[in-house]
């Protein structure tokens, strides 16, 4: 019996965390300085649960382990314990200087705000999802009370 016969779309959410520092190039407030966050990322996907009785994924939209692998490979492994800087001529010299001492400096082609990081993360995750599964939403916390 398929209990999902009338429930066509289900959403799944998994939470991830990583530590990273960034600086907002040219910003007119305190966040222009290098500072860090304990990021919490909530990834929600949607799809229809597999219905085939012989299907090993019967009743699942997606294996949580697969979602974990995708997000860890695309996001967490790159950004955890990193310094994220916008790719600019000024930051290129800063990056070169810092790279002599520190290893995980990530340069991006956007201002590394919470909002822009979400756009980047959405592209990275979406292209890896299995057929029939879509990215529904992302929520990225920079602090316990601030998120996009």
Q: Where are the regions that the model predicts?
A:
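Charge-rich, low-complexity N-terminal segments
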Residues: 2-148
């Amino acid at each position: 019996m398929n209990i999902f016969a009338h429930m066509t779309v289900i959403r799944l959410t998994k939470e991830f965390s990583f530590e990273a520092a960034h600086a907002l190039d040219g910003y007119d407030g305190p966040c222009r300085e290098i500072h860090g966050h304990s990021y919490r990322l909530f990834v929600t996907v949607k799809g229809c649960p597999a219905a085939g009785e012989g299907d090993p994924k019967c009743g699942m939209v997606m294996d949580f382990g697969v979602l974990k692998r995708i997000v860890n490979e695309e996001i967490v492994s790159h950004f955890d314990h990193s310094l994220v800087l916008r790719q600019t001529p000024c930051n290129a010299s800063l990056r070169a200087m810092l790279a002599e001492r520190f290893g995980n400096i990530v340069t991006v082609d956007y201002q590394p705000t919470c909002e822009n990081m979400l756009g980047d993360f959405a592209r990275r995750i979406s292209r890896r999802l299995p057929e029939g599964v879509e990215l529904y939403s992302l929520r990225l916390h920079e602090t316990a009370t601030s998120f996009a």
